[in-house]
Swiss-Prot record:
Pfam families: Peptidase_S8, Pro-kuma_activ
Posttranslational modification: Activated by autocatalytic proteolytical processing upon acidification. N-glycosylation is required for processing and activity.
Cofactors: Ca(2+)
Name of the protein: Tripeptidyl-peptidase 1
PROSITE patterns per the UniProt record, alphabetical: SEDOLISIN
One GO location term (cellular component): extracellular region
Catalytic residue list: E318, D322, S514
Record's keyword annotation contains Membrane: no
């Protein structure tokens, strides 16, 4: 009797376990036992900050569409990185000996069998409409949500950003691909990774104007006054200041603070160029740019090229800031706007930007981007592939400038570790932090200035001494909050509060490292111009030269030794100190000194 009873219990237990496992499999759509044998997971589930994002159902998975981007595995990536380090090292005999677009394209182009394997897989799954980029490194297609779920064994949701109300279709599930494709695909965009959202330029807290900053200290700057009043060639910090007494910053005052002489801004080389990147319907207003230039006594100049969509009558604050200040710093340098992606739930604008650049043989020399996210919200496969794209740009002598972010060190919900930002944490971009000019004339690190040490990327050789010195200075404090062997950022800083732009016919003081990045990018364009005039190469990946100059000629920087980036992160943050620190980097550039050593 006992034997029969025990046997029944065992059988019931086996049936129960089998039922549980079947339910687990069914919970992952289309993932049958046969598929498990033939397919392999190619991504890891990402963490979603539920304080920032709301998860909802997609109303109709058959009509809703998603754009999938397949990053095809490229060749010679190790050799590419070695080459980048050599052409970026001022002590190397190959310094500045960049490759052309076509040379890079042929060097790293995926194998034909990799491209064909992915194309055949799509066709086998009744996906016959897709495009392959000129360089062969990306394949893109638009499919229904239902088809994407079937293809990748995932379940999509609608993710709504609680602050901006922007929504995107994404999955929290790791996707699967056929085992035989594992070595042909780096990542698939449009599945897990949420689009990068800008650390939006905010109206500076000291503004006396409402709803767009139309007033400064009671002085109204409406369109009518712009027509009737004389130019404002510079703001006088004694007469025009925010409520807290800190001065508003005009292009002229910013140049003075960074020692940019008038002769330095005279750009003449036709081979020079610069660009800003804009996503999420951040459009450009030629009218705002024209009035901004007139109002501040700047030389009139126009945008030379707009890649992608633009709606003149629907401008964005981010675009106004970026274009007005990159051109204010480098007024005669040919300037592009690369505009990608609207607000469609199925798009990934940052990835669109990368794909567009990877197919363009006439890339501008300097790019300014004011968008980012936490490293922890992004998969390693995605960041590694994006890093490869940055390496390709560096190998061609291009400079990529990112704002370091507007949330200080960032932190997790438990306040027991910092959350570094990305792409600012990449070793192959120049990350720009923020500083504030105070009413007493001092300049300090901005508490919002994104900075810290990467959890993904190891420390590059060009900043080992600087980061090690800072960590030694910490003397063990905060050691559990950050990765002591990670890439340190930012690299350099500029002004991030009370920077005045013109938006929808009104002058408006704004804040954020979104202001810092285009200011620095414009100055790098000036350096490129002077190098090109002397038949020297463009600066490319500037970081190795920048850190070398800081060691050999520290007078090229205004060292910022006060400030802490503990913005909204409990009570912890990094502090500024003499030398490099993860609040302001190497400090504020002393431009006329810096450019001298860039020409040696």
């Amino acid at each position: 009797m006992n034997i029969k009873f025990n046997l029944i219990i065992i059988i019931l237990f086996i049936l129960f376990i089998s039922n549980v496992n079947c339910k687990k499999i069914k919970n992952k759509k289309h993932l049958t036992p046969q598929r498990l044998r033939r397919f392999v997971e190619h991504s890891k589930p990402i963490s979603l900050n539920k304080k920032v994002w709301k998860i909802t159902e997609i109303e109709n998975i058959f009509s809703a569409q998603i754009e999938l981007t397949f990053g095809i595995r490229q060749r010679n990536i190790v050799e590419l990185e070695d080459f980048v380090w050599r052409v970026s090292d001022p002590n190397d005999s190959l310094y500045g000996s960049y490759k052309t677009f076509e040379e890079i394209k042929e060097w790293v182009k995926p194998l034909d069998e990799s491209i064909d394997a992915v194309k055949n897989w799509l066709i086998e799954n009744d996906i016959n409409e897709f495009t392959v980029t000129k360089s062969g490194d990306f394949i893109r297609t638009i499919v229904s949500i239902d088809k994407a779920e079937e293809l990748l064994s995932v379940r999509y949701n609608k993710m709504v950003h609680k602050l901006s109300k922007q929504s995107f279709f994404r999955s929290l599930d790791p996707y699967t691909i056929p085992r035989e494709l594992y070595d042909h695909i780096d990542f698939i965009g449009g599945v897990n990774h949420l689009p990068l959202l800008s650390p939006r330029p905010k109206e500076s807290s000291g503004s006396a104007g409402g709803g767009g900053g139309g007033k400064v200290n009671g002085i109204g700057y409406e369109l009518e006054s712009l027509r009737n009043n004389k130019q404002i060639k510079s703001f006088n910090d004694k007469k025009v200041a925010a409520r807290n007494g800190d001065p508003y910053l005009s292009p002229d005052l910013i140049r003075k603070e960074m020692n940019v002489s008038q002769t330095s801004t005279n750009s003449t080389h036709l081979g020079n160029s610069q660009a800003i990147a804009q996503f999420l319907k951040e459009y450009f207003s030629p009218s705002d740019l024209k009035i901004f230039q007139y109002r501040f006594g700047l030389e009139p100049s126009q945008v030379d090229n707009i890649i992608g969509p633009n709606q003149n009558l629907n401008p964005g604050i981010e675009t106004a800031l970026d274009i007005q200040y990159i051109m204010a710093m480098a007024p005669d340098v040919p300037t592009w706007i690369v505009s990608t992606g609207g607000l469609h739930e199925g798009q990934e604008p940052f990835l669109d930007w990368l794909v567009d650049l990877s197919s363009n043989p006439k890339l501008p020399l300097v790019h300014s981007i004011s968008y980012g996210d936490d490293e922890s919200s992004i998969g390693l496969a995605y960041t590694d592939r994006v890093d490869t794209e940055f390496k390709k740009y560096a190998a061609m002598g291009r400079t990529i400038v990112f704002s370091s972010g507007d949330f200080g060190v960032g932190c997790n919900d438990d306040c027991d570790s910092f959350s570094p930002g990305w792409p600012a944490s990449s070793r192959f971009v120049l990350a720009v932090g923020g500083v504030i000019k105070k009413k007493d004339g001092s300049i300090i690190g901005d508490e919002i200035s994104g900075g810290g040490f990467s959890n993904y990327f190891s420390r590059p050789w060009y900043q080992v001494d600087e980061c090690s010195s800072y960590i030694e200075w910490l003397n063990g404090s905060l050691s559990s909050f950050y990765n002591q062997s990670g890439r340190g950022f930012p690299d350099i800083s500029s002004f991030s509060e009370n920077v005045v732009i013109l938006y929808k016919d009104k002058l408006m003081p704004i804040g954020g490292t979104s202001a810092s990045a285009p200011i620095i990018a414009g100055l790098l364009s000036l350096i490129n111009d002077q190098r090109l005039q002397k038949n020297q190469s463009p600066i490319g990946l500037f970081n190795p030269l920048l850190y070398k100059i800081a060691r050999d000629h520290p007078n090229s920087f205004l060292d910022i030794d006060f400030g802490e980036n503990n913005y909204k992160c409990c009570t912890n943050g990094f502090k500024s100190k003499s030398g490099w620190d993860p609040v302001t980097g190497l400090g504020l550039p002393n431009f006329d000194e810096l450019v001298k050593y860039c020409l040696e």
